[in-house]
Amino acid sequence: MIITTTGCHSRQEPKVDITPHHINLQADSFYQQAMTLMESSYDVDSTRKCIRFLDKALAIDSLNPDYYGIKAKLLSEMGELDSALHVQTLAMKKKAITGEYLFQLGLLQAAKDMYTEAHESFGQSRAFLQAVLKQYPDSLGAFILAEAANALYEKEDSLFMRDIDEIRKRFPERLMEIEMTRRVKPHSLVN
């Protein structure tokens, strides 16, 4: 007599760690210089100088997601999508990435027609951001990004808000932001 057993396998969300990265003060001083310059000047030379500051920060602390994310943002703003994609891909390989930056990586991948990789990044972003929302349910920024990641993961071009009345109750002081954001088409972020 042969007895076979089958187990129930439930689909579990991937385990994500949203513990904030420990700040290295020496690296952070370069990051803060980059941020100050980035906020005060928008020319190409200043942007390049910001990137050099971020490179110095990364040389000291190669696991801080913000250093990679801001560097990728600056590179993409300069039209250097391949370089931005390389930076965020490296961050992902080092596990120096957050839900926000996984979303950024997905956008960069989609812009380079890497749709399978983008789909995976949006799914990972969604999982990270849902974990953030469990711990910080009042974070509108994480909520909006999670909904955008979900829309792009599900290949929809409608930004969230299935129950708009409930969302308005959840964020009563942010109604203008909600109304402006819900009109964004997630696929327009890729093009």
Residue locations for each model-derived region?
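Terminal, low-structured helical/coil segments at or just beyond the last alpha-helical repeat
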Residues: R11-K15, P137-N191
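Alpha-helical segment of the N-proximal tetratricopeptide repeat
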Residues: I23-I60, I70
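Start-of-helix register in tetratricopeptide repeats
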Residues: D28, D66, E100, L140-A142
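Residue-level recognition of tetratricopeptide repeat
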Residues: M35, E39, K73, L107, ...
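Register position in tetratricopeptide repeats
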Residues: E39-D43, E77, A111-K112, A151-Y153, ...
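Conserved structural position within tetratricopeptide repeats
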Residues: D55-A59, T89-K93, R126-A127, L133-K134, ...
